[in-house]
Amino acid sequence: MLRVPKFLPRLARQAGVVPSHMSGASSMFRNLPGASNGISSQLRYKSGEVKGAVIGIDLGTTNSCLAVMEGKQAKVIENAEGARTTPSHVAFTKDGERLVGMPAKRQAVTNSANTFYATKRLIGRRFDDPEVKKDITNLSYKVVKASNGDAWVSSTDGKVYSPSQIGAFILMKMKETAEAYLNTPVKNAVVTVPAYFNDSQRQATKDAGQIAGLNVLRVINEPTAAALAYGMDKTEDKIIAVYDLGGGTFDISILEIQKGVFEVKSTNGDTLLGGEDFDNHIVNFLVAEFKKDSGIDIRKDNIAMQRLKEAAEKAKCELSSSQQTDINLPYLTMDAAGPQHMNLKLTRSKLESLVGDLIKRTIQPCQKALSDAEVSKSEIGEVLLVGGMTRMPKVQSTVQELFGRQPSRSVNPDEAVAVGAAVQGGVLAGDVTDVLLLDVTPLSLGIETLGGVFTRLISRNTTIPTKKSQVFSTASDGQTQVEIKVHQGEREMANDNKLLGSFTLVGIPPAPRGVPQIEVVFDIDANGIVHVSAKDKGTGKEQQIVIQSSGGLSKDEIENMIKKAEEYATADKQKRELIEIVNQGESIVHDTETKMEEFKSQLPAEECEKLKKEIADLRTLLANKETADLEEVRKATSSLQQSSLKLFELAYKKMSAERESNAGAGSSDSSSSSDTSGEAKKEEKN
C-alpha cells in the first residue's frame, strides 16, 4: 500500500506538464490569433508517417457510418446496399455464414439468438458489472463470463466472441466499403467513441480496429467529432454544446471554437443511456398491454419478442413526425384458442410518458458539464443535436428548456460524427492544416493509497495528451514492494471507482515507512489511453504498463482474433466467388440449352449428345452448390462454355455456307430469267 508522505505536500510535489510538442498549446492558441499556422506546420511535419487514405468511422451502438476526405470536404460513403449508415448487427447462420449490417438485421426475427446487436454497450465491461447484469435481461442473445472476467457473447453452437470481435466484423465491413469506393487498399482509420467511455472501453475499441486489420491512428470522442463537422467551415469564434443521444450512449460536451482551434472545456454523460433503452421501455409497455388483453406473457417467446422490438423501434421513429401510430402484429403468438394478434394505437404523448425518466436522466450531466466548463448557458452560442434519438420532439424541447435556446439542426445527426472523424483523419494525413483539436479526459485518474483512499493524479476534463507525476512513500516499515492500483472515477474511495489495472514495483530497499520515495507518473495519450509508471527514486528501479482493463484482451488473444477475422474474410471471399461462378454456370447452361433448341437442325446429333452430358454434369455440381468445390465448378463451367462455343461456331459456319449457296442459286435464276425476257422483246421489235 502507498501513502502520501506528510513531508511531501501533494500539491507541492505534483507536476502537470504536457509533452514538449504540445507544451503551452492551449493557452497559446487562446491568445494568439495567428498561432494556427505554427500548429499547421507542426501537423504537416507529423503527417509524414501517414501514407494512404485515412477513413473516419463512427462505430455506433445501433448504426455505423463511414466518411473520407475528398479535397477539403468530407464525404459519407454509401454501403453495398446503397445506404449511408450500416446497422451495427452481426449474425451467424446455421451453415456458419457471417452476415454484417442490414442482411444480419433482416433475419434477426428468425435467428435472434445468433444475431448480435448493441454489443458496444458490453465492450470493455466486466460480466459482473451491475449495468451488464441489467442489460442482459433485454438481449435476445446469450452473454457469458469470459476467462478474464469480461462480458462476451455466445452463439447457439457454443462459440464465444468478445465485443471487440463483433465490433471488428462491423469495422471490416466499413473497410471493405471504403476500399470498393476508393478502389485502393485502406489501412488507416480514425474511430470514434462516446466521450464518457473509460480507459478499458477505449482500449477495447482500439483492439476492435486492430482485429479488423486497421491501423487506428486516433480514437476521438463522438461529440468532439460532431463539433469538427460543424465548425470546419465556420469563421466566427463561439462556445458550443454538443448534446449527443445515440442508440446506446449519451454524451454532453462543451467546446470553444476559436480560429480553427477546437478546445473541449468539459464533458459528461452516461454510457448506458440511449435509443436501446427507449425501445426497451416501449417493449415492456407492449408486453404488459398484450398480457392484459390476452392473458399471455410472451417474454419467453424469442420470435415474438424480436417482432415487438422491431415494432417498438418503428413506432418510436414514426412518432417523431406524427401524433399517433398503429402497431399491428398479426399471429404474434399461439395459444389453445388459436392465433393471437396485437393491434393497438400508440400516441406521442403516451410515448413521452413512457420514456420521460430517460430524457430527464440527460439533464444532470448537462448541468454538470456547464459547471465544470465554468460557462453559463447564456454564453453557449450554439447547441448541436447529434444521434438519432435527438429527432424526438420531447428531447428537442428538453434541450431548448435546458440551454434557453433553439437547438441547431445544421449537422446531420446520423452522419456528423463520421464526418468529424474523417476531418480528424485529414488533419493526421496533413490534408487539413487549419484545424487543431484539444480534447479532454472524461474521468479523473488516480491510485489507491493508505486506507483505500482514491488519490487523484489527473482530474477530469484535463486537456490531453497530458502527463502528471506525484511522489508517494511506503505505508509500513521494511516494505520492499508496493502494488500500484490504478482507478478511474469521481468517488473518494478507490473501491467505488473503476479499477483499470494494477502492477507491482519490487526491489525497494527495506527502510522505515515514509522514507522511500516512489514517483508515480500518469501519461494519457491523444487517444485517451493511460500509460502508468512507478519509479523508486533511491534505486532507480522502474516498472511501467499501458493500462488494460483488469480483464481486457491479451496480445495473444488479439492476434488469435486477427487470424480468425482473416479466416472469415477468406471464407467470405471464397463464398462470394463460388456464388459468382455458380451464377455464371447456371447462365451458361440456360444459354446453351436455348441455342441448342434454336439451331438443332444445324447441329450434329453426336456433338449434341456430348454437350447434353456436359450440361448434366454441371447441373449435378450446381445442385450441390453449398458444398461444391469452387475449382471444380469453375473448371466444368469453363469446359461447357468452350464446348458450346465450338459447336455453335460449326452451326454458324454451316448456316453461313447455306446462305451463300442459296444466294448463288438465286443470282443464277435471276440472270436466266433476264436473258429470256430480252429475247422476247427482240422478237416483238422485229
UniProtKB/Swiss-Prot annotation:
Q: Which UniProt keywords apply?
A: ATP-binding, Nucleotide-binding, Phosphoprotein, Stress response
Record-linked CDD domains: ASKHA_NBD_HSP70_HSPA9
What HAMAP family does this protein map onto? DnaK
The record's Gene Ontology biological-process terms are: [2Fe-2S] cluster assembly; chaperone cofactor-dependent protein refolding; iron-sulfur cluster assembly; mitochondrion organization; positive regulation of mitochondrial membrane potential; protein import into mitochondrial matrix; protein refolding
- Cellular component per GO? cytoplasm; mitochondrial matrix; mitochondrion; PAM complex, Tim23 associated import motor
Name of the protein in its database record: Heat shock 70 kDa protein cognate 5
Q: What is the lineage of its organism?
A: Eukaryota, Metazoa, Ecdysozoa, Arthropoda, Hexapoda
Concerning its family, UniProt says:
Belongs to the heat shock protein 70 family.
Region Disordered: list its residue ranges: 657-686
Species of provenance: Drosophila melanogaster
Q: Does the keyword Phosphoprotein apply?
A: yes
* Residue spans of biased composition, Low complexity class: 667-677
The molecular function terms in GO held by this entry are: ATP binding; ATP hydrolysis activity; ATP-dependent protein folding chaperone; enzyme regulator activity; heat shock protein binding; mitochondrial protein-transporting ATPase activity; protein folding chaperone; unfolded protein binding
For the modification Phosphothreonine, which residues carry it? T86
